[in-house]
Amino acid sequence: MSKHDNVIGYIEYLDSSGCVQERIPYVDAEEFKTRIYASLYCGEPIIPVVFPENLSQPLTFEKGTIFPWGLRSEKHELLPYEIYQTNDRKISFLRYNYTKGHINAASYKLVYRGQMECWQTLDSLYCLHNQENRPNGRKMRSLSVSDIIVTHEGGEAHAYYMEPIGYKQVDDLLPGLEQAKKRSVEMGER
């Protein structure tokens, strides 16, 4: 049983353009409903997302409650992600601006495959993979500048180059990283 098996849903907080800025999970139905009502009352743009299979009884709202940005019911699913690292001295531990002319996906190796919750962010993956007891810690170094995280959601993949602060989207490297993944699988690496 995963530590997130008891999550009953999450709230998507939207920015002014309607894009999801943050997702916060909830395990307690009353706390979840209270936060939803508080956000709706203040006019905060949110989309509550409910996992019905994780509820002991249906989540009900007061008659006439309007969700201007929507209310969704979903199956609780984990999203796959991968981490790629390189030992190429021309790009290892360097910012993207210094390396963009030298980056070659073929120099990267798939070092980890895992699953993340839909509310997890690149920053939360960074924290997870920089702990002393990080996943696959014996076979990969902690995450650092020049590493690439590939996320998968809704049939789309996106690649992110780790910068000293933040991430640079590098989807143009996806075809080469897919080849690196195939090489790793053929060699029996995980």
Q: What does each model-found stretch correspond to?
A:
Residues 8-12, 80-84, 148-150, 158-161:
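Ordered hydrophobic segments in well-structured contexts
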Residues 58-117:
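Extended boundary segments
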Residues 105-148:
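Short, conserved turn/kink motifs that form compact alpha/beta structural patches or helix kinks used as
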Residues 139-178:
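Short, compact, well-ordered microdomains
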